Amino acid sequence: MNVDDDFEYYVINLDRSKKRWQRINKHLQSMSIEAQRVSAVYGADLPDDEIARYYTPYLNQKQFFMPLKPAEIGCFMSHRKVLKSFVDLSDKAYAVILEDDVEFIGDVLEYQQQWLDAVQGEEPVMLKLFSRRQVHGQVVYTHQGRSTIRPHLVPLGTQGAVLNRSAAYQLLNTLSQFGMPVDVAYQHWWQHGVRVLVTVGNHINEISAQLGGSNISNKQNLPLTYKIKRESKRSWFRLKIKLISMFYYMKS
């Protein structure tokens, strides 16, 4: 079976980051993968009326502990753009969505059965391919020593994921407007209705540091008191999400 038979590969990449696209495209082509490049949305360049179509202060106050940065808004809109491209333009069953600062660990062919075990079927499912920390949860699939778990808490980050068409439609419909970062939104599976699974052992490496770090963030020199207040809010928010997630996990 050709690696492209079931999966459509997408790479989110800023227009100005040509070298990143060239690097990851070469990496993927070495495994006979022809990926679709999706031009990332650069939040700092968005007009206010375009932002207001998707990001609202009302939702932000309800959903998150601080206003989103332009980079976070652009990131969310970029991921929506990929999902829209998949459902509108692809006839394949599954999408593999990658950011441009990753690379696969080993050959993709080694992972495909694990992906299929997770996302095939009518239920909307997303399989995350990377986590910075160990993830705890229930093992739902095991194939040739590779396990997939349903996590107690969905890990942050959107470095790479596989999802089926049902999941793409579900996320587009339920996250048409937002007030929190896209990876935080994905943590709220009890709201968007997509089953989120995670591979035990990463399938990709994050190599942002080797490429010069993030190319979308605008670092600012902020007062120490502001930083302390922000981190205090962040800690409380993360604890709240962890507790709520465990509550719904135990109910399901």
Where are these regions (language model features)?
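An acidic/histidine-cluster motif and surrounding catalytic segment
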Residues: 1-98, 102-252
